[in-house]
Amino acid sequence: MTKIAFTGGGTVGHVSVNLSLIPTALSQGYEVLYIGSKNGIEREMIESQLPEIKYYPISSGKLRRYISLENAKDVFKVLKGILDARKVLKKEKPDLLFSKGGFVSVPVVIAAKSLNIPTIIHESDLTPGLANKIALKFAKKIYTTFEETLNYLPKEKADFIGATIREDLKNGNAHNGYQLTGFNENKKVLLVMGGSLGSKKLNSIIRENLDALLQQYQVIHLTGKGLKDAQVKKSGYIQYEFVKEDLTDLLAITDTVISRAGSNAIYEFLTLRIPMLLVPLGLDQSRGDQIDNANHFADKGYAKTIDEEQLTAQILLQELNKMEQERTRIINNMKSYEQSYTKEALFDKMIKDALN
């Protein structure tokens, strides 16, 4: 029996593709294990959503692009992570490794190379992240969500495969969504998502302008972990820190979304034809990957975008109004998008590329 190791973590986006592919692997009779960090969001997601597979926690350090004393400590964490991962891989003897990226993946990919285990890596963003740039040196192939990403990668290793969307995305139940929220079916629903880490600035603007927003929408507010404000209670407004199983039902009742611009999330909105106002992570918090993603979607006519540095209540409300006026055009643009690979076709390609 072929055995597959998966890795990737740090954010929801570094786990969601794995969550899409693992059930396909299991349904076809493959044995699966997951290697991630000890305390990252990937551990919570994998152990809660796929309790039947083995999860191996390893030491991991953060990859920083700036000078910091923490870098010295993290070198030792990464080295320990390589040893941890090598021990797991020697024990489990997987036939291949699929890596979704994030800093935890680098020691796993290096360990796999040292044991001659073929590795396929996946890049969701328009420009490759630092972890995948390092991992690519030890991998057999890299798959990309954006076709334009091929311009940044060696031709012999890179393949464009498009977005990989999880199986249950289109199975959301609107009736369940309205029951969960207690919302009125005859009024539009606005979903606000600040990403897995949340956005304090976006959260603050939403709360300060709830009265204006509630004139037009009912609001589902995903605040991020630890950022829910229990004191804010209004009819037509509901807060969650983070939603797992019920998210598809909430998406089924969503008319418009305000969101960060992580690749996996925005491709899910695109697949569901939900017009989106994107507020990407700024350069002070990231390498600019979400800015590239957001601008690409805006150029395609799928979304509107606001730089977080320019985000004010007035601009947010203005852009929402503009988007509602252009709603039909945006949805028609979205209809031109077609998924490149089904999960099953992508999985078959992964097996073929790794083992041939």
UniProtKB/Swiss-Prot annotation:
Membrane topology: Peripheral membrane protein
Cited function: Cell wall formation. Catalyzes the transfer of a GlcNAc subunit on undecaprenyl-pyrophosphoryl-MurNAc-pentapeptide (lipid intermediate I) to form undecaprenyl-pyrophosphoryl-MurNAc-(pentapeptide)GlcNAc (lipid intermediate II).
Gene coding for it: murG
First-tier enzyme category under EC: transferase
Family: Belongs to the glycosyltransferase 28 family. MurG subfamily.
Originating organism: Staphylococcus aureus (strain MRSA252)
Subcellular location: Cell membrane
Pathway of action: Cell wall biogenesis; peptidoglycan biosynthesis
Name recorded for this polypeptide: UDP-N-acetylglucosamine--N-acetylmuramyl-(pentapeptide) pyrophosphoryl-undecaprenol N-acetylglucosamine transferase
